Every structure is written in C-alpha cells, then in structure tokens.
C-alpha cells in the first residue's frame, strides 16, 4: 500500500545554532512552525525532497566534482596550508585586496564533495544564491572558515579539508559520512569589515582619554555602524556612530597628526549620523550633527553633508533653508542629478505653499456675499493651511517611497498629532500601502509595501 507524504517546506529554527556546537557537543533546537505559510508565500513549497530536482537552472558541470580520483593524488598537486588543509588556486583573486580577515561579512559560493563522488553533498549553488557568513563567529565548520580566510575577493580555489576540521569522526549519516575528508570548491565574491561593537567597552577607565588606545576601537565602531546601515539596522548604526563620536571627543591628542586623524574620523561619523537620522525620520538630530560638522570643517562642509541637511530641513518644513542647502551642495557638484531634482522639488513646494498661503489670507480678509456663510477666523484658516501642507508633504514622501526599492520605512508615532496620524492612515490606504504600529515598540510606525511579509 502506498504511503501518503505531505509536501514540506524548509523549517526555520526559533533560535540559531552553530555548526561548531553541533559537531563538538551536540545541540537542542526547536522548529518555528509559524513560518510555514511565509515559506509558501515565497514559493518555497516543493513536492520533491531532492536538492537536485529543485536546482533545475544550475549548470550540471558547475555541480560536478573537479576531481574524482583519490585525494592523495590531488594533495600532491596542492599547497599545504597546515596539516589538515591543502589548497589549489584555480583563479587568482584581486591582488590589491587583502585575504578575508577576522570580523568580516563574506559572501561565497561553494560546493563540497566526498572522495570519489561526482555530485556534491552540499552546495550553495543548489540553493540558487551565494552564502554569507561572519568570520570569527563559529557559524560555519572550522575547516571551511580557515579555507575562506586564506582567499582574496574574486579568487577561486579547491581545498581538501580533514574530517578533523569538518564533521569529526561521527559525521551525520547518511548525508555526512563519518571520519571523511572532503573536497571543497570555493569562490570568494567579496567581503566587508563589520568591526567590533563591544571592543571599546574593554578599554580600562584610565586609558579612555588616550587617543592611541581609543582610536582603533572607534574605527571598529565606525565599521560596525556601516555594516548595520547595509543591513537596514539604522538604530544599531546610530548607536555605534554615537559611541564612536563620544569616545573620540573625550580623547586628548598628543600631536598634530593625532588631531588630524580625530577630525577626519569625526567628520565621517557625523556625516554618517546625518544619513542615519534622516533614514530614521529624526531631522532635528540631523541638523544638530550639521552644526558639529560646520565646526569640524571650519564652515566648509562636504557636498554629502549639505545634501543631508537639505533633506532634514525639508522634513521640518523649512523649504527655503532646504533649497539654500541644496544650492550650496550643487555648487560643489554641479553635475549631480539627484541634487538638481531635489532643488526642482523644493521650488515646487515653495511655490505651492506660497500660493496656498495667499489664497488662505485672501479668503480670511475678503467679505462673504452670503450672510449664511460661516466665517472662519484667521487662526482656523492658518490651521487648515498647516494641515494641507502636512498632507502635501506626506503624500510627496509616500510617492517617493513607492518609487524606491525600499520595502518599508519607519516613523516615530510621537512626532505626529492624532489628526496627522489619521491623515497618514488615509493616504496610505489611498496608495495601497500598509501602516502598522509595532506591538513591541509603541512609538514605531511602519509604512510598507503590500508584498512585505511580517513574521
């Protein structure tokens, strides 16, 4: 009699686990069943339990093992990294880039093969995407990380890795053989430094005013902040940049060179904070950072800083000041189309606002022909003008958001009155967008496109 098997989807874990813990001492884990519907929405359902049947678009030659003879013969053609890893370079990487360092986010393509077998027991190609991990975190088997750490961006290489640095003597049958060395074919696509967000906490209190001690840790915080921005974690990025600024401001410099390095890094950090604050819809903080930048640059901020100042001022409704900031940025980069587009947008906003103001005040001081008409006070008319101005700004922001690749943007609920919140809800509905209030952070409003799925 045939058995009926239900189609399955990949199961997500409630908490992540590392391969190193799995191999060394074993781990317990729980499956998050609530994610099954999301897997179906993303097209991850499959009636097949074979990785190969799901990889129809992958070239079979790419998946085929580059060596099907004994590993001893291949080792003779390789260079020894250490007693457990042998390497053969098949494509040279970028010579002007260093090998993958510790504390880096690296993206690779790889396939792993058992001795004498043509098909891989594991391959990122079967999943149709690159594999990304952080070095130094123990999230991949030790042998693969050591191999990747020996490579430069763009490099392709083959490695024979001892079972001692892979899955140990027991393995995980039937897919992972016990006490088996493996051949790995690896390509490093690129890497970026992620820094160390906690390194600065280890500085002794008596050394926290010494520039030579603090500066490397501030650089680490800067790298961590940049990495957080790439991942869309703007609050984490802001915290990292703020801590770096605070630590540098507290330092005493011993010479002109240290002062130059401090000013250079503080300038970069404050510019990055302006970008992050604008992303977080905190324009007032962005303007505060601009004051610090003007002091650091002796009144000559960069084009990037002026552009971000323009965005912050526009968000605050200071259109004339925003246009002036954009014009100063344009003077530094006349050919920059993005700046030109913002200037045109500001000119339209200013004209529209001035026209609306003239119309409101004209109605405020004109005589009504009909006595039955209810006359509005200048204060009421001014309130209507502000409400209309808010609606225009919010609609413009929503239109710009719809035209970007971003899937969601967050706001602070406390920044809006109840009337403004109601108006925003109405506009979001008109534009077929979702406006949700976080159940965890009550102050966070999220505007998202209809195809965004939340866990």
Swiss-Prot record:
Changing residue 335 to T: In PB70; weak allele that only affects female fertility without affecting male fertility. Residues 34-54 are annotated as: Disordered. TPR repeats lie at residues 218-251, 303-336. Residues 44-54 have a biased composition (Acidic residues). InterPro entries: FKBP6/shu, PPIase_dom_sf, PPIase_FKBP_dom, TPR-like_helical_dom_sf. It is found in: Cytoplasm; Cytoplasm, Cytoplasmic ribonucleoprotein granule. Keywords: Cytoplasm, Differentiation, Meiosis, Oogenesis, Repeat, RNA-mediated gene silencing, TPR repeat. Disruption phenotype: Recessive female sterility with no effects on zygotic viability. Some strong alleles (WQ41 and WM40) also lead to male sterility. GO terms for molecular function: Hsp90 protein binding; peptidyl-prolyl cis-trans isomerase activity. SUPFAM superfamilies: FKBP-like, TPR-like. Residues 103-192 form the PPIase FKBP-type domain. Belongs to the FKBP6 family. This is Inactive peptidyl-prolyl cis-trans isomerase shutdown. The gene is shu.
């Amino acid at each position: 009699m045939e058995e009926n098997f239900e189609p399955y989807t990949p199961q997500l874990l409630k908490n992540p686990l590392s391969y190193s813990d799995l191999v060394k001492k074993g781990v317990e884990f729980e499956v998050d069943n609530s994610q099954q519907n999301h897997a179906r929405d993303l097209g991850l359902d499959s009636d097949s339990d074979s990785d190969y049947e799901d990889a129809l678009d992958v070239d079979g030659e790419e998946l085929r093992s580059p060596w099907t003879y004994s590993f001893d013969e291949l080792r003779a053609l390789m260079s020894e990294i250490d007693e457990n890893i042998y390497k053969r370079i098949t494509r040279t990487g970028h010579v002007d880039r260093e090998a993958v360092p510790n504390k880096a986010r690296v993206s690779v393509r790889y396939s792993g093969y058992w001795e004498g077998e043509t098909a891989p027991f594991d391959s990122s190609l079967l999943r149709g995407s690159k594999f990304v991990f952080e070095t130094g975190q123990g999230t991949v088997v030790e042998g693969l990380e050591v191999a990747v750490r020996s490579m430069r961006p763009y490099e392709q290489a083959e490695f024979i890795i001892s079972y001692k640095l892979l899955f140990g003597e027991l393995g995980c049958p039937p897919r992972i053989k016990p006490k088996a060395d493996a051949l790995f074919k690896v390509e490093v696509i690129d890497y970026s430094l992620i820094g160390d967000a906690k390194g600065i906490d280890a500085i002794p209190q008596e050394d926290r005013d010494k520039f030579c001690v603090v500066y490397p840790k501030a650089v680490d915080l800067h790298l961590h902040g940049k990495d957080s921005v790439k991942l869309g974690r703007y609050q984490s990025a802001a915290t990292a940049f703020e801590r770096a600024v605070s630590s540098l401001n507290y330092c005493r410099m011993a010479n002109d060179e240290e002062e130059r390095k401090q000013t250079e890094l503080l300038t970069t950090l404050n510019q990055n904070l302006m970008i992050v604050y604008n992303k977080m819809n905190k324009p007032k903080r962005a303007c505060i950072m601009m004051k610090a930048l003007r002091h650091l640059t002796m009144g000559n901020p960069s084009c990037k800083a002026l552009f971000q100042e323009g965005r912050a001022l526009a968000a605050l409704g200071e259109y004339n000041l925003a246009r002036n900031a954009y014009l100063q940025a344009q003077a530094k980069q006349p050919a920059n189309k993005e700046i030109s587009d913002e200037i045109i947008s500001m000119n339209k906003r200013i004209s529209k606002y001035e026209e609306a103001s003239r119309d409101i005040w004209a109605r405020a001081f004109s005589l009504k022909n009909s006595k039955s008409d209810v006359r509005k006070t200048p204060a009421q008319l001014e309130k209507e003008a502000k409400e209309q101005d808010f609606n225009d700004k919010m609609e413009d922001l929503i239109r710009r958001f719809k035209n970007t690749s971003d899937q969601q943007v967050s706001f602070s609920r406390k920044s809006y009155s109840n009337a403004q919140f109601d108006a925003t809800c109405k506009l979001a509905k008109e534009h077929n967008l979702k406006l949700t209030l976080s159940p965890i952070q009550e102050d966070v409003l999220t505007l998202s496109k209809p195809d965004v799925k939340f866990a």
